[in-house]
Amino acid sequence: MGKRPPIPPDIENGPPPPARPHFRPPIPVPWVAWLVPLILAANFVTFATTMYVNDCPARSDECLLFDVLGRLSFQPIKENMLLGPSIPTLRKLGALERRLVEEGERWRLISCIWLHGGFLHLMANMISLMCIGMRLEQEFGFMRIGALYVISGLGGSLVSCLTDSQGERVSVGASGALFGLLGAMLSELITNWTIYENKCTALMTLILIIVLNLSVGFLPRVDNSAHFGGFLAGFFLGFVLLLRPQYGYVNPKYIPPGYDMKHKKSKHKCYQHIFRFTSLAILLAGFIAGYTKLLREHTIQSMPFRDFN
């Protein structure tokens, strides 16, 4: 009686210091993919225009599906097994042919990736574009994927020209650009290796897809040199454009007050920067050397796929 209760030690020592705030970085919002569907639509419109210009009924009585398609009907199977136009029409509209490129028509290095040899050729490429391109655009945005598509297509066209010793091969198609997207997927996996969970599974699956697609290029009348050139261009460009922040990085604008900045992680790892600048140097050197060889009318004599085109 008359005794005061003991003072709790926490009152004497004051309130405990506030715990370091714990938070999760905001989940990135995926991009809305509109460029890939636009490219797909452009390819279909270009093919329809090609068939209209081709006008098979004006030159042949054996046009395929004339009753249904009329002027847009296909050349006879003996001329084009892919259900498409004639070679002169493709040449007229911008197909890649080294002889014409050397005569000053450099625009064919780009225009050829929007043309296709036939409806079957078009559908195969567009299905691949939807499967590969949509996911990449949702993750990395239209600017980087658009640059990848065009530059890879240009790289494929350049290698195709350089491996054509006769200068008379006519080449069309978006395959070089599509292989560039595959190459970029591989380099993206390598440079962002630390953020993947099932690393080996993802790598082996991607390599299997790439090998299967490259093996198709050894079939007759397939320009595998364009596939190879596009793949290389996309592979090196992927190191430049498709870097992801390392796990645990948070943009400074999302960091709450009171957070210990000593624990803040850098956006990219050192090896990512090394890959980026090395790949950019290789890419620029390759394009400059290739274009210089083309202007000087040189050919690449030691490519393993030259005889399969």
Swiss-Prot record:
Organism phylogeny: Eukaryota, Viridiplantae, Streptophyta, Embryophyta, Tracheophyta
Record GO biological process: proteolysis
SUPFAM superfamilies in alphabetical order: Rhomboid-like
UniProt entry keywords in alphabetical sequence: Hydrolase, Membrane, Protease, Serine protease, Transmembrane, Transmembrane helix
Example GO molecular function: serine-type endopeptidase activity
Function: Probable rhomboid-type serine protease that catalyzes intramembrane proteolysis. May function in reproductive organs maturation.
Source species: Arabidopsis thaliana (Mouse-ear cress)
Family membership noted in the UniProt record: Belongs to the peptidase S54 family.
Record protein name field: RHOMBOID-like protein 5
Listed transmembrane segments: 27-47, 113-133, 140-160, 170-190, 200-220, 222-242, 274-294
Cellular component, GO annotation: membrane
